[in-house]
Each structure stands twice: as C-alpha cells, then as structure tokens.
C-alpha cells in the first residue's frame, strides 16, 4: 500500500495542479472518485491483475465505462498512467488528490485512536488543539482500541504521534532487551 501511495503521489500532484489551474477541482475530484470506485470493484480488480490483460485494455474499459463523464485532462492522466503501467495506483491517486484538495480548502483529516471512548470535552479540546496546530479545519475520526491500555494515537497525513501506554511499554521492553 505504501508503495502505491509513493507511485501515486506525482500523478496526483500533477493532476491537482492542472485541476487547480483550470478551476476544476470538484470535477476532477468526482471523476477520480468514480474511477477509484470502478478499479476497487472485485471483478475489475481481477480483470486488471489478469496477465493476459494489457494496460491499454484496462484503459479502454475505463474510458468506455465512464463514457462522456471524463474530461480530456483526466483522459490524458489515464493515458500517461497506462503508458507507464501504473493504472493499479488509480485509487491511491484519487486518495492523494483528495488530501491535496482538503489542504487547499484548509481542511485536514485526522484519525484519533484511544483506549476508551473520548468524552465530549476531550473531543472539543483535541479538536481545538489540532485546528491550531495545522491551521486548518480538522475533521476527526475517532476509533477505540482497548489494547492501547490508555492514552491516544493521532494520525494526520504523514504526521503521527503515539502517546499510548502500549507504545511506552513496547519501548521499555525493547530498551530492557538490549
């Protein structure tokens, strides 16, 4: 997965720049989301990994399925990805594009994992702190993981912090083992 994100990033960044210059961020976002949904389908995934199916075959199918719902610039992106045999990273391109769009809109997505359900007051404080840190409107998804024992883990894009008791115990165990 990390490898596909790395492959996808330059395509997504180039697509984002074109979409931004053309004033078509929403249009690109919708088209990439639709393409991502198509390539994520089980049948399509099986088709794409079939050794007898070429990148050009996949490209033709994607263009045929989307028909007139693709603008010429998105078709160009698909052509370049097909030429480089990178259509398998299409979902990740859509994902990175959305991250870039959110940053442009001063929105950031965060995942907060805690050992127990956060209270309303804790959520307010955490939201305010993250909004200030990232100078953006942070959309937080909360998850529970009792294995953390206590504390929280926060992930925002490439930035992460692990303040869980489990992490501290693992570090202590590693230090003792040395």
Swiss-Prot record:
PANTHER family: ATP SYNTHASE DELTA CHAIN. InterPro entries: ATP_synth_OSCP/delta_N_sf (IPR026015), ATPase_OSCP/dsu (IPR000711). Its main location: membrane. It is found in: Cell inner membrane. The lineage of its organism: Bacteria, Pseudomonadati, Pseudomonadota, Gammaproteobacteria, Thiotrichales. SUPFAM superfamilies: N-terminal domain of the delta subunit of the F1F0-ATP synthase. One of its GO terms (molecular function) is proton-transporting ATP synthase activity, rotational mechanism. Belongs to the ATPase delta chain family. This is ATP synthase subunit delta. Pfam families: OSCP. The gene is atpH. Keywords: ATP synthesis, Cell inner membrane, Cell membrane, CF(1), Hydrogen ion transport, Ion transport, Membrane, Transport. It comes from Hydrogenovibrio crunogenus (strain DSM 25203 / XCL-2) (Thiomicrospira crunogena). One of its GO terms (cellular component) is plasma membrane. F(1)F(0) ATP synthase produces ATP from ADP in the presence of a proton or sodium gradient. F-type ATPases consist of two structural domains, F(1) containing the extramembraneous catalytic core and F(0) containing the membrane proton channel, linked together by a central stalk and a peripheral stalk. During catalysis, ATP synthesis in the catalytic domain of F(1) is coupled via a rotary mechanism of the central stalk subunits to proton translocation. It is a peripheral membrane protein. F-type ATPases have 2 components, F(1) - the catalytic core - and F(0) - the membrane proton channel. F(1) has five subunits: alpha(3), beta(3), gamma(1), delta(1), epsilon(1). F(0) has three main subunits: a(1), b(2) and c(10-14). The alpha and beta chains form an alternating ring which encloses part of the gamma chain. F(1) is attached to F(0) by a central stalk formed by the gamma and epsilon chains, while a peripheral stalk is formed by the delta and b chains.
